[in-house]
Design a protein with these regions (language model features):
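N-terminal beta-strand motif that seeds the catalytic metal site of vicinal oxygen chelate
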Residues: 1-20, 77-79, 133-134
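Vicinal oxygen chelate
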Residues: 2-4, 46, 91-134
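Core segments of cupin and vicinal oxygen chelate
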Residues: 13-61
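Short, conserved charged micro-motifs
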Residues: 20, 86-91
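Exposed loop/turn and edge beta-strand positions of beta-sandwich/beta-sheet ligand-binding modules
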Residues: 43, 75, 114
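A short, acidic/glycine-rich surface segment
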Residues: 62-67, 103-104
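Helix-adjacent hinge/juxtasegments
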Residues: 69-73, 77
Length: 134
């Protein structure tokens, strides 16, 4: 048997403050916040977009409370999101939202060809790349 994965369903981001992170991803990137309680007293905040989601895990959570990778650090992620919006419109939106544009628009290499990317950081310092294919 050979195995070939086909898509990313979700990922977990370790954050200092779930509310601050969720509000930023809602306001800046237009994601939908969904809060669930998989077991009594254990709330999980997820940010939904397209067919994916990001679970926001508080860095203070223990492995028993929320099983995750061995190294837990907020602000260590580097994520690229795709959009159909024009790159300059993305940069303008970020600035209008009070978010500093670190770089871009600039051409980069994406998984399926050339993308035009705009870079910023989320409240924890993770690098956020917002891109569109040429």
């Amino acid at each position: 048997m050979s195995l070939a994965v086909e898509a990313l369903d979700h990922l977990v981001m370790n954050v200092k403050d779930v509310e601050t992170a969720a509000a930023w991803y809602e306001r800046v990137l237009g994601m939908k916040r969904v809060v669930t309680e998989p077991r009594p007293g254990a709330k999980v905040t997820s940010m939904h977009f397209g067919r994916q989601k990001i679970n926001l895990r508080p860095i203070a959570a223990t492995q028993r409370e929320w099983f995750t990778g061995e190294q837990v650090a907020a602000g260590s992620d580097d994520l690229c999101f795709l959009t159909k919006a024009a790159p300059q419109a993305v940069a303008d939106h970020l600035r209008a939202s009070g978010v500093e544009v670190i770089e871009g628009p600039t051409d980069k290499r994406g998984a399926m060809g050339t993308i035009v990317s705009v870079y910023c950081r989320d409240p924890d310092g993770s690098l956020i790349e917002i891109s569109s294919y040429k």
